[in-house]
């Protein structure tokens, strides 16, 4: 599905590497492609990326859309479950969820709490079990594509 939708072409011509931890650059590139790969118009606010980086346009798009901010991008940062749903939620326009995230490990005042509640309402995720969401756990490439499929692929 993700290849057919031009969200990713994999890690090589014959592999996707679903069990590899996804980086910030990768998830934002996936989201940029999932949103049609629009040409960014803003100047580069980041000191740690250049036009030669494969994720350059995705990073600028993410900054324009308010998904990320600051002067450093941190492309190789491991992507967590909280980051994943927050990026997806912001890309969707930050819609207000009807309820709250009902997980023992998601405080109501967490920056990502609304994003988690939205992701549950949209059936993107149901948590990791035992009443937890595991916001600090890293996401694999396979998990992120699964989240995207649940959000957009049906």
Can you name each region flagged by the protein language model?
Residues 118, 146:
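Predominantly extracellular/luminal carbohydrate-interaction, adhesion, and secreted-enzyme modules
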């Amino acid at each position: 599905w993700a290849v057919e939708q031009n969200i990713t072409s994999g890690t090589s011509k014959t592999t996707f590497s679903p069990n590899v931890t996804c980086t910030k650059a990768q998830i934002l590139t996936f989201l940029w492609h999932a949103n049609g790969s629009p040409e960014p118009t803003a100047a580069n606010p980041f000191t740690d990326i250049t036009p030669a980086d494969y994720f350059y346009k995705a990073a600028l798009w993410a900054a324009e859309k308010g998904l990320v901010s600051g002067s450093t991008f941190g492309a190789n940062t491991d992507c967590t479950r909280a980051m994943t749903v927050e990026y997806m939620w912001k890309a969707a326009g930050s819609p207000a969820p009807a309820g709250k995230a009902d997980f023992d490990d998601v405080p109501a005042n967490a920056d990502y709490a609304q994003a988690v509640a939205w992701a549950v309402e949209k059936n993107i995720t149901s948590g990791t079990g035992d009443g937890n969401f595991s916001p600090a756990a890293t996401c694999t490439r396979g998990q992120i594509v699964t989240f995207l499929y649940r959000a957009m692929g049906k």
